């Protein structure tokens, strides 16, 4: 309908705007007649051959429905043209309120919407961030190998008092003021002493007990205990120790290396593989930490207002991710889909993600960044490496445009971050491996 309508725009404050569009009566009638004739050519009406009923008959039967369809078509075409005419960058889905459409009268509707913010990027020049360097010593490597030995330990039943690092099988019943409380008891419960899996005083109280011995422990729940019914309360746990088991660690030799998939090179090859895995883990974490530091600087230097509609959409996305995680953990997808989740806890994260998305898109645009084919290939290979047939997965990605574009977005983001890093000063800071592990676990 190119240009056959009137439109006016009103700025409502912030990123909110309103379009008022009026389509002249003659355009409404023209569109109605055209639609009526089109329907008449294909309509199947009793007592008439297909397409042979007169427009008057068709109008009597379908006039109201045709008029509604015309309204939808006029909105679609005129709104698209109005957005182009006013050079609007509409964010999210617009809210359309329309008057009743009538033949012979102008058709008016109002569109409330948000626009994307105008962004003028500020350089990060003058900013400083710290890059963490982690050195893995031989002592760190020895500790990791010892941890691996413990993972592959065989547990032998012992006829002696329990001590730290033992695995015990117990029956216990907890009471408050002499009454059992929910989830306060268990039978044949397996516990490793020193794991700090239970509240303070529980595991320590078992140390020194002998198999078959029973004991009452007076323990107070911490004030910040997650269950409000138990927080700060004094409880009594009646415990019976069934079994004491101690770990028998495998010898650190070529046979142990073979158990871990090392077919050649023996212990030396195992040490190298373990060191490589340790380096990969800390490198991945520290790279992410560095990336987030750069992105935080980007947000600090470029405060922008973001469309509320995009924040709400991102909250929906984050909630969907939560439901998927719950479904995987519980193996109850139907229940997870129905989970009622509050929106406010997601708002801060959603707002930050939307800001970063807009700012990074501007970095890519301003610096004319294109996804580097070599980096893209490396990313695809990294993903494919975790599958049984990597080459097949790689081929699948390169024949699936949608999936490849998702990895391309990650590569573009990495390249944008690299561009930002070139603008600021990076200072290296060395920390011990144990400190790096603590940061990873936080």
Swiss-Prot record:
**Which SUPFAM superfamilies does the record cross-reference, listed alphabetically?**
FKBP-like, Triger factor/SurA peptide-binding domain-like, Trigger factor ribosome-binding domain
The gene from which this protein is expressed is: tig
Q: Supply the name of the protein.
A: Trigger factor
What Enzyme Commission number(s) appear in the record?
5.2.1.8
Q: Which InterPro entries match?
A: PPIase_dom_sf (IPR046357), PPIase_FKBP_dom (IPR001179), Trig_fac (IPR005215), Trigger_fac_C (IPR008880), Trigger_fac_C_sf (IPR037041), Trigger_fac_ribosome-bd_bac (IPR008881), Trigger_fac_ribosome-bd_sf (IPR036611), Trigger_fact/SurA_dom_sf (IPR027304)
- Say which family it is in: Belongs to the FKBP-type PPIase family. Tig subfamily.
Q: Which NCBIfam families match?
A: tig
UniProt-annotated location(s)? Cytoplasm
Q: Which GO terms describe its biological process?
A: 'de novo' cotranslational protein folding; cell division; chaperone-mediated protein folding; protein transport; protein unfolding
UniProt keywords (A-Z) are: Cell cycle, Cell division, Chaperone, Cytoplasm, Isomerase, Rotamase
Source species: Coxiella burnetii (strain RSA 493 / Nine Mile phase I)
